[in-house]
Amino acid sequence: MIFMFHSGAMELLKIAEKLYDKDSEKAVEVYDKAIKKAERIYDDYAKAVILSNIAKSLYSRGLTNKVIEVYNKAIKIAEESSKRDVILSKIIENLCSNRLIDKALEVVNKISDDSSKAIALSEIAKAQYNIGMHDEALKNYDKAIFITEGVFDDEIKSSILFEISRDFYNYGLVDKAFEVIGKIPYSKYRFRLLDKMAEDLHKNIKYIHGE
């Protein structure tokens, strides 16, 4: 909702993305205008997240020379904001989307809130696993799981652990999925994944029997 009041930078970003395939040099000029427009936004959250979105877009179009610079602008704003951890988590999502894993790992160390840090680490772990960095991914998943021990809100803890257990199940790491399910405080989250497992098993049995 907050971005409705900062549509100028967002509109310029959309124009740059559409223009890139036709005229990359002109698109770069529009990206620069979008960055300048974003930097004039008063609200820290909107400013940092929009800059991060611009950096993500630049990277996806191969304009990598400015990416880290723009991400760093967003990170600096986040560090000075009262919404620090929330903004840094959003930035990490974009960094993972760009597969800038080392930068994401650098940023995650700046997060102090346990729930935000656990979510960010599991986001990084998922990105690592998807590009074949399996050992590193499992280590970061383990870190995220350990950090949830300091999360006192059982709803938030259950949600985080559910997402991790679902990731493990999707990777075919069923034993690890069950291990994490056992740590989930709220049964509704446990049964959500267990029901999915039972449904998949039923489908596989029907397939084997040619039904």
From Swiss-Prot:
Source species of the chain = Methanocaldococcus jannaschii (strain ATCC 43067 / DSM 2661 / JAL-1 / JCM 10045 / NBRC 100440)
Instruction: Name the keywords, alphabetized.
Output: Plasmid
Q: Which InterPro entries match?
A: TPR-like_helical_dom_sf (IPR011990), TPR_rpt (IPR019734)
Q: Which domain of life is it from?
A: Archaea
Name this protein carries in UniProt: Uncharacterized protein MJECL18
